[in-house]
Amino acid sequence: MTGTPLLSFEPLTEGILLKRYKRFLADIELEDGSCVTAHCANTGPMTGVLIPGQRVRLRHAPSPTRKLAWTWEQAEVPGADGQLCWVGINTALPNRLIRATIEAGCLREQLGEIESIRAEVVYGKNRKSRIDLLLQPSREAIDQRPIYVEVKNTTWSTGSTALFPDTVTTRGQKHLQELMDVLPEARAVLIPCLSRPDVTAFAPGDSADPRYGELFRNALDAGVEVLPCCFRFDRDGVTWQGTRPAQGQQPSAAL
């Protein structure tokens, strides 16, 4: 089902990134020469995808309830194959994208038939956490355990390997532990949302967060399933590119 369109939207506006600042803001020069300030949902370091002077794509959505009418959605970067490629950098999109992927049946082989999907469901030992997606298998499924899905937007890469995280993430560490905690009564699935089409594998970003890498390997040993999903980002939509294999450790060349 590679090539399946999953999301479509009004064509994005292209421009040139001037700078990002205060974590949430980016100044961008549009094609007509005007400059706008856009909201940047990705507050991390954006390793490898934050390049002043690069082409970017913005969504224009003016609203009385929004301070900024523009949102930074995509960035053009050098790809693993030497060609330029577009990367989805809006961290608000992956949960919606993975849900659309499941609903389209692209992960039927890995997850089975799914009867229902719930988002942001409270769970955890102290009931203070929320799982991104909670799936209920169909009545015909042999394995009736609920499926807890944690989604991670992944934009950093070295060579053709996608890496997460690109900085220390105590929140991400906590999510791995919580996935392990639901086993074996439920299935636990970590889905790295590979928001660039040029990668052929996924690995934990050990060089950015060694503790996360350690917990990632513990999670694999405990039975947490890792299902990297790859996508192509275009000006007017997002297309399914298939799953990618998960590696237990960041390639040595990148450490």
From Swiss-Prot:
This is Sugar fermentation stimulation protein homolog. PANTHER family: SUGAR FERMENTATION STIMULATION PROTEIN A. InterPro entries: SfsA (IPR005224), SfsA_C (IPR040452), SfsA_N (IPR041465). Belongs to the SfsA family. GO terms for molecular function: DNA binding.
